[in-house]
């Protein structure tokens, strides 16, 4: 295949990472992004790697699978991780970022790379004669989605994804909330709105009876469990809320708390957490409260949360349809297409779920697109690593039951020898082996 550059289509998390990895290997890149020419309902700017759901990249500890994945990506020179570290905001033991600052930094690093040419245009055909990484994400334009759908033998998959509302911090009644991280882990990074049992029951009733924005009549409601609308959780029952986004454990009242409580209990019946959304600390999002309620209903119901009675919503929660491929049948472990070998796919459309996972898939696809360009052997990352196990899972899962997957220790190859019973010790050992195997892999 004679060519002088590689195409990358889509400048989200996966596409930005793929383009950067290719360019860092000395290969010119044409990075296509349709925003600027054609917008989507969910994106607010034309910047690359815009975060449309949460601003959290989740846990940072190596005993957390996504923490291990992030460490592997750091060692591989990830532009997404570098930008995230530079724009992080307080979030306890998690890595959360200033939403706008993060996407702006990624845009600057990628667009200003001397080997990357940014083309603001919509691509409607799958290239056949140029090595191309397709990372158009869950919001792929209809024209291109149709071509990918055909590659998929017409058998597309989808689920619904939702985002949480964002609030102006100056409109929160600080006398009714308190600053604390669960179990006092890390710095006190979350505002906590405690509820008594009666307050929770009233809130739950209002939530389950609130009016949702309509879906297309021909589409079934299918949700990814990790980003399920709060009203759907509420309809599953009270315990789903109390063991999910509103769980109170580890969030005891502070000694100086004077608000309402149930008797002498030291822990609230339920807690709503708010997490800082930008570096200035002027915006907070409601953690786990992704929603598809009508906007008027969001205001009515969420203003029942203590401290949010007069809250101003700078962005209401929204929901969008995510499409993904039959990766077990369509992709190699390198994210290369089995049916059209000049194509690589990356991001949520491949069935990886989550910001970090999307960027990781872009990193692997970019590395392998560059290796194909240079006529080098493909790089299949070890299944003992988080990055390798994720690539292996989405390309080897049972196609009939394939659903999007977050990185987790369950998909990473088991340790050899006797099973370590202590979970933390076992995860530490898996992480230690993963990083050692990654270093060895990179030296070969």
Swiss-Prot record:
List the Gene Ontology MF annotations in alphabetical order: flavin adenine dinucleotide binding; tRNA (uracil(54)-C5)-methyltransferase activity, 5,10-methylenetetrahydrofolate-dependent
User: Which Pfam family would be a valid example here?
Assistant: GIDA
Tell me the keywords, alphabetical order: Cytoplasm, FAD, Flavoprotein, Methyltransferase, NAD, NADP, Transferase, tRNA processing
Any idea which positions bind FAD?
10-15
Leading EC class: transferase
Keyword Glycoprotein belongs to the record = no
Question: Gene3D superfamilies under this entry?
Answer: FAD/NAD(P)-binding domain
Q: Read off the HAMAP family from this record.
A: TrmFO
Which NCBIfam families does the record associate with it? gid_trmFO, PRK05335.1
Tell me what this protein is called.
Methylenetetrahydrofolate--tRNA-(uracil-5-)-methyltransferase TrmFO
Question: What is the primary gene name for this protein?
Answer: trmFO
């Amino acid at each position: 295949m004679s060519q002088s550059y590689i195409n990358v289509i889509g400048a989200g998390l996966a596409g930005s990472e793929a383009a950067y990895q290719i360019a860092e290997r000395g290969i010119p890149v044409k990075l296509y992004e349709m925003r600027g020419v054609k917008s989507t309902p969910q994106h607010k700017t034309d910047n690359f790697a815009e975060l449309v759901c949460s601003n959290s990249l989740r846990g940072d500890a190596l005993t957390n699978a996504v923490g291990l994945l992030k460490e592997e990506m750091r060692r591989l020179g990830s532009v997404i991780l570098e930008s995230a570290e530079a724009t992080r905001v307080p979030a306890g033991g998690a890595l959360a970022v200033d939403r706008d600052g993060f996407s702006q930094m990624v845009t600057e690093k990628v667009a200003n790379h001397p080997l990357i040419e940014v083309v603001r245009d919509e691509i409607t055909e799958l290239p056949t004669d140029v090595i191309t990484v397709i990372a158009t994400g869950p919001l792929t334009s209809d024209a291109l989605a149709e071509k990918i759908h055909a590659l998929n033998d017409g058998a597309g998959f989808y689920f619904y994804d939702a985002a949480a509302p964002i609030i102006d911090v100056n409109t929160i009644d600080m006398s009714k909330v308190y600053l604390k991280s669960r179990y006092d882990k890390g710095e006190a990074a979350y505002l906590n709105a405690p509820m008594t049992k009666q307050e929770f029951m009233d809130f739950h009733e209002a939530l389950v009876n609130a009016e949702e924005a309509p879906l297309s009549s021909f589409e079934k409601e299918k949700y990814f469990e990790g980003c399920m609308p709060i009203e759907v959780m509420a309809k599953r029952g009270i315990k789903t809320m109390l063991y999910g986004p509103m769980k109170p454990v580890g969030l005891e009242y502070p000694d100086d708390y004077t608000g309402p409580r149930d008797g002498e209990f030291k822990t609230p019946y339920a807690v709503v957490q708010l997490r800082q959304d930008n570096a200035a600390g002027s915006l907070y999002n409601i953690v786990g409260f992704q929603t598809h309620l009508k906007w008027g209903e969001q205001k009515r119901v969420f203003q029942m949360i203590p401290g949010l009675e007069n809250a101003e919503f700078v962005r209401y929660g929204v929901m969008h349809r995510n499409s993904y491929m039959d990766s077990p049948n369509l992709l190699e472990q390198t994210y290369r297409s089995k049916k059209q070998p000049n194509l690589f796919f990356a991001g949520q459309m491949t069935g990886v779920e989550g910001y970090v996972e999307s960027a990781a898939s872009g990193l692997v696809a970019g590395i392998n697109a560059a290796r194909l360009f240079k006529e080098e052997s493909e790089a299949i990352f070890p299944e003992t690593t988080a990055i390798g196990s994720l690539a292996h899972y989405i390309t080897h899962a049972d196609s009939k039951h394939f659903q999007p997957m977050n990185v987790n220790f369950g998909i990473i190859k088991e340790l050899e020898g006797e099973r370590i019973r202590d979970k933390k010790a076992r995860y530490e050992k898996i992480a230690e082996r993963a990083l050692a195997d990654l270093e060895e892999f990179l030296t070969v």
